[in-house]
UniProtKB/Swiss-Prot annotation:
Modified positions (Phosphoserine) in chain numbering: S61, S87, S271, S283
Chain segments annotated as coiled-coil in the UniProt record: 1-284
Location of Phosphothreonine modifications: T53, T108, T252, T282
Written domain comment of the UniProt record: The molecule is in a coiled coil structure that is formed by 2 polypeptide chains. The sequence exhibits a prominent seven-residues periodicity.
Biological process annotations from GO: actin filament organization; muscle contraction
Keywords: Acetylation, Actin-binding, Coiled coil, Cytoplasm, Cytoskeleton, Muscle protein, Phosphoprotein
Subunit organization: Homodimer. Heterodimer of an alpha (TPM1, TPM3 or TPM4) and a beta (TPM2) chain. Interacts with TMOD1. Interacts with TNNT1.
CC terms in the record's Gene Ontology section: actin filament; cytoplasm
Gene Ontology terms for molecular function: actin filament binding
Protein name: Tropomyosin alpha-3 chain
Residues that bear Phosphotyrosine: Y261
Alphabetical list of InterPro entries matching this protein: Tropomyosin
Gene: TPM3
Length: 284
């Protein structure tokens, strides 16, 4: 009799354990179904996003073609203008050499002048010109320092956004690992759903890789358009500059301005790339 009671208790305990496992399996099955639905929604969104990216790539291809045609015309115009500028520069060089010789003769004549007051006035005017130029150079340097600080601030902000995205990605990966561990404990009823979930995940990864490929092509087209646009602007500026007046050629100032403009474009491009990366990773 005692053995029968023990047997009944064991059967009752097995029944309770079986019920617990059944409830746990049902809960995990529900979670797997919800996860499958979520991934299906993400898959549909990714397909829609890929369609938009393909349309946008077509648009960038047309824009790239137009920019290349404009660049060819501008480069031809710039080449003609540069040839004229080279000729004018040779003439300017001859004039400058003659001017140097004349200035040397003038300096020799001035040294022989007996009127010290006139020489002092000339020296004073020369000092004022030098002081004015030095003041302008200092103002320009201050402006460049301010612009450089702004560029550094943009780069620091971009680094901060990148670190924030990296932290979010680590959290998401941790959540995904825990979810996969719980899904592995499900009973045979959720096994088929897990297989379907794996297939959907593989499709999603494939689409993500495809999207990354399109994004890279998009970035490449954007960079090429940007480079061609910059070259077009530079060629047009050089042509207009040469046609307008050779006397306005101030090589040192132009080099500094071009270098500063390139740095601003560089930091702006870095900020935009990191913003795109942040948006893409957040949407994923």
């Amino acid at each position: 009799m005692e053995a029968i009671k023990k047997k009944m208790q064991m059967l009752k305990l097995d029944k309770e354990n079986a019920l617990d496992r059944a409830e746990q399996a049902e809960a995990e099955q529900k979670q797997a179904e919800e996860r499958s639905k979520q991934l299906e929604d993400e898959l549909a969104a990714m397909q829609k996003k890929l369609k938009g990216t393909e349309d946008e790539l077509d648009k960038y291809s047309e824009a790239l073609k137009d920019a290349q045609e404009k660049l060819e015309l501008a480069e031809k115009k710039a080449a003609d203008a540069e040839a004229e500028v080279a000729s004018l520069n040779r003439r300017i060089q001859l004039v400058e050499e003659e001017l140097d010789r004349a200035q040397e003769r003038l300096a020799t004549a001035l040294q022989k002048l007996e009127e010290a007051e006139k020489a002092a006035d000339e020296s004073e005017r020369g000092m004022k010109v030098i002081e004015n130029r030095a003041l302008k150079d200092e103002e320009k340097m201050e402006l460049q320092e301010i612009q450089l600080k702004e560029a550094k601030h943009i780069a620091e902000e971009a680094d901060r956004k990148y670190e924030e995205v990296a932290r979010k990605l680590v959290i998401i990966e941790g959540d995904l690992e825990r979810t996969e561990e719980r899904a592995e404990l499900a009973e045979f009823k959720c096994f088929e759903l897990e297989e379907e979930l794996k297939n959907v995940t593989n499709n999603l990864k494939f689409l993500e890789a495809q999207a990354e490929k399109y994004f890279q092509k998009k970035d490449k087209y954007e960079e090429e358009i940007k480079i061609l646009t910059d070259k077009l602007k530079e060629a047009e500026t050089r042509a207009e500059f040469a046609e307008r007046s050779v006397a306005k050629l101030e090589k040192t100032i132009d080099d500094l301005e071009d270098e500063l403009y390139a740095q601003k474009l560089k930091y702006k491009a870095i900020s935009e790339e990191l913003d795109h990366a942040l948006n893409d990773m957040t949407s994923i």
